[in-house]
Every structure is written in structure tokens, then in C-alpha cells.
Amino acid sequence: MTRPAVSYDELDEYLRGDGHNDYVGVSAIDGLIAAVVAGPVTILPDIWLPHVFGGSMPQARPGSIEERLVNTVLNRHDEVESLLRDAPGHYYPIFMNHKGKTIVGPWAIGFSLGLSLGGEAWAPIAGNAKASDLPHHGRQSAAGQTAHPAFSSGAAEIESNRSSSHHIRSPAVARHHKTGPITTQPPAQTQPYRKTACSLRLQCTRSVEHDTQARGGPCIPGVSGLKLGLRPADRWSGCRWEHVVAYLGSPLYESTSTCAEGADRQLLVLRED
């Protein structure tokens, strides 16, 4: 049963608060959820959900707006889990749209946080990379969990992260709070481009069978390949995702991919020239 909730735009407005650039928006939350659901290990809400609300859970009294905000995030988690399990071809990330341009950066930042929460379990997916090579951005909490700078940071730490190419830039970066309505529809095809080098590359040697995209048209491939690719007896085989990447660095990476039937599936793709 769906919990009482608010719309995604309402959630984004509440999270925006006073408009500071370090707020976490719905698109970043959706990236976090995607990594949590698609990851090789179970990560309980008690671990990942506080990252959405600045490191601690709000006082969600029954019937309160805080309860509905939490419910909205949990409902999206359940929806993504259901889609990636039962209908991965129908999963679409929640990206932001600004003046007709699809902005993927905040989603990738959230996805990168999800990677860091998975820790050692992501090492097999990273090919020959050691688990220590995967990004663990931010500070360590008392419980040993990484507190992601984009989700819960003071002003000094945000500025420190922003000035270093080895950390993920604050998700707003003068643009996050100016974005328009949230969309979950596949965006129109655009030409991907790269502005800075990428610090993280996950090599995956599996992709979807051709029939999963037989309906045609532009699409954003589901990140479920990261999860289902670990199962030896499933229907994911054959092709490959070349570079599945959570974008690190500055400025925001803006791109979409269009998948033709039978083509390699690519999500947040950066290529080395």
C-alpha cells in the first residue's frame, strides 16, 4: 500500500529550504535510491535515509508534513525496487530539466553516494579495481558510514570539497536551485559531452537482451544491469555497458543517451579521448 505522500515537486521545494546551494534535491535522492536498490547488498533505510535529511531523521509524527516527506522517498524506493525486479525496461531516472536541457549531474551525485554506502560489495563490479579504489567521498561518521558532502555538510567542508577535483562538487553548483519541473520521462536525444576528467569508472561486461527495448524510441537504460549482471542464470548477457559512471568533478555533467534496439546500453557515459 502506498504511504501518504507529497508530489516530487513539493518534496523538492521543502528540501530546498532557504535556497542554499548545498540542499539535496529529488533527482539526487533518486540516484541514491537507484544505487541502493541495484546494489549487490541490502542497505537498510536506517542507513541510507538519514543522508537525505542532513544526517538524521526528521521527527515524523503521524499525519505531519515530515512524515509525508519521508513517505515520498520511501514510496519512490519501493517503486524503483518493483520496476528493477519486474519491469526494468520501464524504469526511468528522475532527472532535472532546465531551459529544455536535461541535467543528469545531481542524479549521478546521488548514485555515487549509493556506491559509497555499498563499500566492499561493489568491488567485483568494478572489475580489476580494488574496493579501496571506489570513491568514499565525505567524512566518516561515528558509526563508520560515509557522510556525503553533497548531502550533509557545513559551509567550510562544502567549500573544501568544491575546491578539490578529487571530491564530488556540491549538487547545486549555482544551478541546482534554478532548475525547472522534475520529469521522469525519457528526455529527447542530446549530444553528450565531457568537461573534466572522471575519477570513477565501473566496467560492466553485461547488458540487456535486444527484446527489452523492442518498443523503440529514446530511452534511458535502467541501472538494474548492475544488480542483475551479478546473477549467472538471468537473461542479462551478451552486449556490454561500456562505461557506467557516476560523475565526479566540476562542473555538472549534462548528458542523455538514446538506445536503439540491439545497441550497447550506456548510462552517464564519459569516454577517454
Swiss-Prot record:
This is Uncharacterized protein y4jE. Residues 164-179 have a biased composition (Basic residues). Keywords: Cell membrane, Membrane, Plasmid, Transmembrane, Transmembrane helix. It comes from Sinorhizobium fredii (strain NBRC 101917 / NGR234). InterPro entries: YgfB-like, YgfB-like_sf. Its main location: membrane. Pfam families: UPF0149 (PF03695). Residues 132-194 are annotated as: Disordered. Residues 183-192 have a biased composition (Low complexity).
